């Protein structure tokens, strides 16, 4: 069953706060929204077959791969759908390389799960159809 989330939906707010914190390099703010058993699979990690398990590894990814490479990095959720116990989030991420100055503006989708009021899982997709299939919807 799919339903569009209302702005007041608690799970939506958790995701919004986590990504706002990451987008502003607020590491402590992001950690506050992560479940102790979080599994994060950002786009680059998915390409390498990696996952970051636990808040400390997500923080290491943020500090060692994002904050050192990008002058700014923004995750901008635009639409949320609940599919069972998970969320399908669509939006974009924007970034500018520190050394290269290259700017990115990429459409993205995320499959997200929230448990106990914290993000416990997320995977980033640049192929919306693949994200839909992953969450059990038609591509």
Regions found by a protein language model. Give the residues of each.
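Hydrophobic pocket/interface hotspot
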Residues: 15-18, 30-34, 38, 54, ...
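Short hydrophobic/aromatic segments of transmembrane alpha-helices and their interfaces
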Residues: 12, 40-41, 103
């Amino acid at each position: 069953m799919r339903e569009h989330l209302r702005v007041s939906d608690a799970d939506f707010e958790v995701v919004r706060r986590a990504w706002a914190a990451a987008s502003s390099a607020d590491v402590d703010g992001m950690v506050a929204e992560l479940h102790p058993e979080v599994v994060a699979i950002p786009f680059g990690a998915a390409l390498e077959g990696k996952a970051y398990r636990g808040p400390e590894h997500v923080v290491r990814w943020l500090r060692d791969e994002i904050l050192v490479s990008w002058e700014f990095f923004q995750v901008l959720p635009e639409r949320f759908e609940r599919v069972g116990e998970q969320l399908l989030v669509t939006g974009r991420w924007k970034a500018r390389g520190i050394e290269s100055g290259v700017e990115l503006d990429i459409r993205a989708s995320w499959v997200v799960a929230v448990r106990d009021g914290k993000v416990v899982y997320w995977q980033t997709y640049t192929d919306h159809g693949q994200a839909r299939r992953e969450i059990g919807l038609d591509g």
